[in-house]
Amino acid sequence: MMFMVKIITRKVKDIEPLENALLIEGLPGIGHVGRLAAEHLVHEFKGEKFLELFCYDFPPQVLVKDDGTIEYMCAEFYAIREPKPMIVVLGNTQALSPIGQYHLAEEIVKIGIEYGANFVYTLGGFGVGKLCEEVKVYGATTSKELAKKLKEHDILFRTDGGGIVGAAGLMLMFADLNGIPGICLMGETPGYLIDPNAAKAVLEKFCKLENIEINMEELEKRAKGMEQFIEKIKKFEEEMLKAAQAKPPSEEDLRYIG
């Protein structure tokens, strides 16, 4: 028995299809790396929202904003015309179930093609479980020719196999099935923090691959703020460890020794 997941789209603005556009996915994932990178593209290149997508496999809730109004769980499509045509997909969630992930990825690629996309980029994080002094960027692609191009830009490939979960992986599959090339870029991240530094590393590789320039000042500010936050955590942990080591055992502690 085949289960269908209902997806609703709502046009925010009528736009003409772009020509030879890049479809760029930046939905939430590990360290919010892809989302931060894609949001930065939209912000810096004045992206224009033209479509919203709602999926019945999104979390069954709405978010409440500071002013008391609600925010839907949805994906949003933005059109960028300069420095080159792009369709950027942002959102506050991904689908919850495997079947929902498949339907969502397929629909996003379908919409991208409808609006002129002929190349797909998916952006995300590569969880390593620890802080990274220098962020490495890993990649995956739909062809050997593109893999060679990634290597020329010092983008690494996993040597232990593994998979890419969610929209970042499935959109490459649906792009390939539709005869469209695609690349996934993943920045190393601890996985337990929102990571603007990894987003910056991913965006730098993207810009080199596409031969475009972008102002990174805003991301650099966020990365600096996160570094300061991490330093505070480290300092607090060190102080706690020193205090624990310096504290003599109490009588109660001694009762349990030997």
Swiss-Prot record:
Topology in membrane: Single-pass membrane protein
Pfam family, one: PAC2
Protein location: Membrane
InterPro entries named among the record's database cross-references: MJ1210-like, Proteasome_assmbl_chaperone_2, PSMG2_sf
Keywords: Membrane, Transmembrane, Transmembrane helix
Segments traversing the membrane: 163-187
GO CC entries: membrane
Keyword Transmembrane applies: yes
Protein name, per record: Uncharacterized protein MJ1210
Source organism of this protein record: Methanocaldococcus jannaschii (strain ATCC 43067 / DSM 2661 / JAL-1 / JCM 10045 / NBRC 100440) (Methanococcus jannaschii)
